[in-house]
A protein has these predicted regions:
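Alpha-helical transmembrane segments and their immediate juxtamembrane cytosolic regions
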Residues: 1-262
Length: 262
C-alpha cells in the first residue's frame, strides 16, 4: 500500500493508492468548506495547487527522502490538483469552452512551444516522483496543455468513432488496462520465449532468456524492429480487457449466488 508497486506484474496500479487517498481528502475537505460556507471550486483549486506544488518542491529539494510513506504522501499531494482540474473544468469551464478550434490549438501550441524552448526537459515521472527538472509549476502547466490538446482531439473523433464497439470496449476497461498492461506485455514475451524453445532457436533465436527471467523491463523485438512494438500495444490492451471480462463474470456469478442464498 505504501509503495503502490505491489507485484511487478501490477506496477501499473501504483496510482490506485494515492487516488484513493485523494478521494477521501476531497470529500473531507469539501465537507469542511461547507461548514464554514466557503464551498467554492476556485478555493479548492488554489488550495490543492498549493499542496501539489509543495509536494513537488519536496521531491526537488530532498530527492533521497522520496521513499516509503513519504512517496505515498507526495504522490497524493501531486494528484490533488490533477483531480481538481477535472472537477473544475466540469463545474466552471465546460460551459465557457466555446473557443473556435483554430484559436484553441494556436494557444496550446504557443504554450507548448514556449515550454519546449525555455525548459530543459518536460518529462517527469510521477510513479517514482522524479525528474522534476523545471520547478514545481511547469509540470502542471505542461499537463494542462496536454490534457487540453487531447480533449480537443477527442471532440473531433467522437462523431466518427464515438459509437464504435471497439472504442467503447477499450473505454470501459481503462482501469483494467492500466493495472494489467504489464501482464499483457509478459504474455507476448512468453509467446516469443515459447516459440524460441519449441523451435530450438530457429525462431526468435536472439531472445535473451536471462534478461527475460531477471527484468520485467526487457522487451524483445525480433531483429530489433520497432514495428513489433505495435504487437505489444495489442497485448497490452486486450489481455487486460480479457482479464477484466473474466473477473467481472466471476464477480457477477458470486454476487448472484450469494443473494440467491439470502
Amino acid at each position: 500500500f505504501v509503495d503502490g508497486e505491489a507485484f511487478q506484474y501490477n506496477l501499473g496500479s501504483w496510482f490506485v493508492y494515492p487516488l484513493f487517498l485523494v478521494c477521501i481528502i476531497n470529500v473531507l475537505f469539501r465537507k469542511f468548506l461547507k461548514l464554514i460556507h466557503l464551498d467554492n471550486e476556485f478555493i479548492v483549486l488554489i488550495v490543492y495547487l498549493a499542496i501539489g506544488m509543495i509536494g513537488i518542491n519536496t521531491a526537488i529539494e530532498n530527492p533521497t527522502a522520496i521513499n516509503g510513506i513519504v512517496k505515498l504522501l507526495v504522490r497524493t499531494m501531486f494528484f490533488l490538483p490533477c483531480y481538481e482540474f477535472g472537477r473544475f473544468y466540469k463545474a466552471v469551464l465546460e460551459k465557457k469552452d466555446t473557443l473556435n478550434n483554430v484559436a484553441y490549438f494556436a494557444i496550446i501550441f504557443a504554450v507548448q512551444l514556449t515550454l519546449l524552448t525555455f525548459c530543459k526537459d518536460l518529462e517527469y515521472t510521477p510513479s517514482s516522483f522524479t525528474k522534476f527538472n523545471n520547478g514545481f509549476i511547469i509540470p502542471y502547466i505542461s499537463s494542462i496543455t496536454a490534457i487540453a490538446f487531447w480533449l480537443s482531439v477527442s471532440r473531433f473523433l467522437v462523431p466518427a468513432i464515438g459509437n464504435s464497439k471497439l472504442v467503447r470496449l477499450i473505454a470501459d476497461n481503462t482501469y483494467g488496462i492500466m493495472v494489467n498492461q504489464l501482464v499483457g506485455f509478459m504474455c507476448l514475451k512468453f509467446v516469443f520465449y515459447g516459440l524460441s524453445r519449441i523451435t530450438s532457436g530457429a525462431l526468435f533465436g536472439d531472445f535473451n532468456v536471462a534478461s527475460f527471467k531477471s527484468s520485467i523491463w526487457y522487451y524483445y523485438l525480433p531483429n530489433g524492429l520497432q514495428q513489433w512494438a505495435f504487437l505489444y500495444l495489442i497485448f497490452g490492451l486486450f489481455v487486460p480487457i480479457l482479464i477484466s471480462i473474466i473477473l467481472n463474470k466471476i464477480c457477477h456469478i458470486a454476487h448472484s449466488s450469494i443473494f440467491k442464498k439470502v
